């Protein structure tokens, strides 16, 4: 078993004061996006299979998941690498794997390969994450949300590639 990947907290992305607020805003916007998209998919067999497996989309984005919020706060408080791993694993199991089925698979492109390769340079990837502008979330469209989701997904994919069967 290899050593655990360590995430260093980008100050702009998360700090003690805004971690929960950022999480809440992102969750709200992704829930709205997914809810809008799902209305067109009611008769789609893949959507029905997905819904049967994961239930309602909104249950995937665990807005009231206190453990998830607590883990994010712990991360923001520069918690141990072990806790950081718990965060990554929790994001994977409860959020990114299911959402990737909806948001990522239909829009995969060469850009994903470039992003994934960028993940090999953790400092570069953290810089990308730390420069996200959360002040204009109201203006984010589905493309923006999808791109941010993909950014997080590919980053966590790289960090966890030896830890999870993906």
Swiss-Prot record:
Alphabetically ordered keywords of this record: Host cytoplasm, Lipoprotein, Myristate
Cellular component terms per the entry's GO annotation: host cell cytoplasm
Superkingdom per UniProt: Viruses
UniProt keyword annotation of Lipoprotein present: yes
Induction conditions: Expressed in the intermediate phase of the viral replicative cycle.
InterPro entries assigned to the protein according to its UniProt record, in alphabetical order: E7R_orthopoxvir (IPR035345)
Record's comment on post-translational modification: Myristoylated.
Lipid-bearing positions (N-myristoyl glycine): 2
Subcellular location: Host cytoplasm
Pfam families attached to this UniProt entry: E7R (PF17467)
Chain segments annotated as coiled-coil in the UniProt record: none
Homology family: Belongs to the orthopoxvirus OPG069 family.
Name this polypeptide is given: Protein OPG069
Source organism per UniProt: Vaccinia virus (strain Western Reserve) (VACV)
Gene name, Swiss-Prot/TrEMBL: OPG069
